[in-house]
Curated annotation (Swiss-Prot):
Gene3D superfamilies noted in UniProt: Medium-chain alcohol dehydrogenases, catalytic domain (3.90.180.10), NAD(P)-binding Rossmann-like Domain (3.40.50.720)
Matches recorded under PANTHER family: SORBITOL DEHYDROGENASE (PTHR43161:SF9)
Keyword Zinc annotated: yes
Record text on cofactor binding: Binds 1 zinc ion per subunit.
Cofactor(s) the record lists: Zn(2+)
Descriptive protein name: Putative D-xylulose reductase
Amino acid sequence: MRALVLEKKGELSLREIALPLDVGPDDVKIAIHTVGVCGSDVHYYTHGAIGSYVVRAPMVLGHEAAGTVVETGANVETFKAGDRVCMEPGVPNLSSRATKLGIYNVDPDVSFWATPPVHGVLAPYAVHPAAFTYKLPDNVSFAEGAMVEPFAIGMQAASRARIVPGDVAVVVGCGPIGIMIALAALAGGCSKVLISDFSAPKLKIAAQYAGIVPVNIGERSLVDAVAAATDKWGADIVFEASGSPKAFADLFDVVRPGGAVVLVGLPVEPVALNVPAAISKEVRIETVFRYANIFDRALQLIASGKVDLKPLITGTYDFADSIKAFERAAQGNPEDVKLQILLTGEKG
């Protein structure tokens, strides 16, 4: 079966590769339709590793996906051939302590698509547990279905924040995940969300959503912008979504006393944190790693029409041009939010 393979750092190829396609009793086989290009996919392409996860052998990329069920296992009663679906890419050990606690996203044994050594799904077909597969409502397109995965991260962040209706939030970093967090925070009850970045094009994209206030920190300090928006009280919630070490310096200057800081962006190296400032304000600190028990909620919110992710899809490529999609993503064009790859017509 032909797939997009990361051979090693900086080298991609479209080639035949043997992938596991045996359908177990609790599995579904899916004809992949749309796959999003994630920042982690690009990082593996450009750097060959993310932390301790190192590409040591050829690996198929892609984990943000939607498609159509073509075969079901003997025990599967909730799906049938022809069902349109999206898939949660992380499958934990269902007997693990983390899973039993409901925090399967931090299960050390989780198997996550396109995370070494596990193959991703930029290929015509994939087999996946039915328990981590979700039907797409009729009004949700394949393109939107492939956006559920990154939006679930935003939903996890909003959930960890414990939003109270009317809260004012700040999102540091206007990348794809930052915008997802802002939209999830608004859907969760925030009255407005300030989102900061140096990139005017990205801020312009975010600003098209009602309730999102862009702050260009190349022109104005975030501290001043938040002070003006909150009568110098500070934001109820601050989401750090950039992963930039410099961003951590101001976090406790923009959060209100008794507020919350939610860390989502993953720095490459350890960063300094102003613990005395956090303690003096009694700030609650939360962290986010992927998501758990929230994929279906993210899908339901998209289906409700309360969150429209379609404007964030800034480029679509045929599977034959998927290397070009990754080359474009690696350039970091400021006008791009989410690129997607279509596998329609591929038959293996």
